């Protein structure tokens, strides 16, 4: 280990920054956040330093480097664009046994600055030992996505509860299970963020007083249309916290690779006209796992409330008294159209968009007359097998045969394939495509040649 990671208490302690530019400003923000009594020494200062000085937040010393400013310091940072001057600052600090950071010169520094994730009082520091700051930043960004924004407030609140929790729960195991429940409780985190004292008290009392083997909960999470990068931040956090993940075939392998490693995975994939697992059985799986006290994520492709039968699953849980929540996802219409260069609405071509299921069951006739109207975009989910019928009905009710259409297969994935043509060709085009596919019909499809960015990548 080349560097010892430590967290310094700098509140009301003298610190010095030599330099008055943008880099020095970034370092100054960190020291001010830590409560340091800060002096900045430079020949000139960018406006932000002047504003801080006018607000009484720091002291500016304009002029050449003054070594005597180090005499009362606990910590120093050399942040100029003059390597020789930075070296002088480092040597002067070393002579006084003061830790000194030298920007972009780790070998000349007695300490280095890590990438920081601030969820105070929870702090996470990531460092590559100065060898690869970009790598450290990338790792920080990944960790940022895993830590809820309000986690720090929950941590502070947990400190206030420690005494009561120790009295309430006799064993270490019971206390650990309580804290695990508290730290993943979204309602408590949101209540703390909003300073909603009534909700904070109610949620806390519920968590403390309910039996530790109490029923679990189910979180309905939209996985998005395929590209793992389109999974929402909250969706990622939920699958990282799950005990059980119940997922369907539209959830990509890349997204499943993000699931917590020791979580149980239950595949309930479905295909049009054939259900690998009946919907009622899926409902019962969710109910059964939650009743065991587990945190269950029902992971669905796209958005769970758009042709995802999410409402049916939640009704079952609601009737059984199982707590649940919903994390929306990017629906296939949004993802596939964006990755195909097809805007769903456009000032000149479409003032509305309709999302329609292509499962045209007997006795469930669609309002074809309204669907055939101009100035709108139609998006058919699961419509591949009914493409010929869709073509026939729309033309029958007055839609022009030359209306542009597109079919998007495996939308947003690296294997995405798009084929376009006119409405008179729709049935024929569909025979060239495989599921999962989305059908887009409307004048906006004509913009694809100009706006198609994804195929160029």
UniProtKB/Swiss-Prot annotation:
InterPro entries: 4pyrrol_Mease (IPR000878), 4pyrrol_Methylase_sf (IPR035996), 4pyrrole_Mease_sub1 (IPR014777), 4pyrrole_Mease_sub2 (IPR014776), CobA/CysG_C (IPR006366), NAD(P)-bd_dom_sf (IPR036291), Siro_Cobalamin_biosynth (IPR050161), Sirohaem_synt_dimer_dom_sf (IPR037115)
Binding residues for S-adenosyl-L-methionine: 225, 301-303, 306, 331-332, 382, 411
Reaction catalysis annotation: uroporphyrinogen III + 2 S-adenosyl-L-methionine = precorrin-2 + 2 S-adenosyl-L-homocysteine + H(+); precorrin-2 + NAD(+) = sirohydrochlorin + NADH + 2 H(+); siroheme + 2 H(+) = sirohydrochlorin + Fe(2+)
UniProt-annotated catalytic positions: 248 (proton acceptor), 270 (proton donor)
Any one of the GO BP annotations: methylation
One Gene Ontology term of the molecular function aspect: precorrin-2 dehydrogenase activity
One Pfam family matching this protein: NAD_binding_7
PROSITE patterns hit by this protein: SUMT_1 (PS00839), SUMT_2 (PS00840)
Range of residues in the leader sequence: none
Domain of life: Bacteria
Keyword terms of this UniProt record: Cobalamin biosynthesis, Lyase, Methyltransferase, Multifunctional enzyme, NAD, Oxidoreductase, Phosphoprotein, Porphyrin biosynthesis, S-adenosyl-L-methionine, Transferase
Enzyme Commission number(s) of this protein: 2.1.1.107, 1.3.1.76, 4.99.1.4
Residues annotated to bind NAD(+): 22-23, 43-44
Listed pathway(s): Cofactor biosynthesis; adenosylcobalamin biosynthesis; precorrin-2 from uroporphyrinogen III: step 1/1; Cofactor biosynthesis; adenosylcobalamin biosynthesis; sirohydrochlorin from precorrin-2: step 1/1; Porphyrin-containing compound metabolism; siroheme biosynthesis; precorrin-2 from uroporphyrinogen III: step 1/1; Porphyrin-containing compound metabolism; siroheme biosynthesis; siroheme from sirohydrochlorin: step 1/1
Location of the region described as Precorrin-2 dehydrogenase /sirohydrochlorin ferrochelatase in the Swiss-Prot/TrEMBL record: 1-204
Start and end residues of each stretch annotated as Uroporphyrinogen-III C-methyltransferase: 216-457
Residue positions where Phosphoserine is found in the record: 128
Functional note: Then it catalyzes the NAD-dependent ring dehydrogenation of precorrin-2 to yield sirohydrochlorin. Finally, it catalyzes the ferrochelation of sirohydrochlorin to yield siroheme.
HAMAP family: Siroheme_synth
NCBIfam families: cobA_cysG_Cterm, cysG_Nterm, PRK06136.1, PRK10637.1
Family note: In the N-terminal section; belongs to the precorrin-2 dehydrogenase / sirohydrochlorin ferrochelatase family. In the C-terminal section; belongs to the precorrin methyltransferase family.
Name of the protein in its database record: Siroheme synthase
Gene: cysG
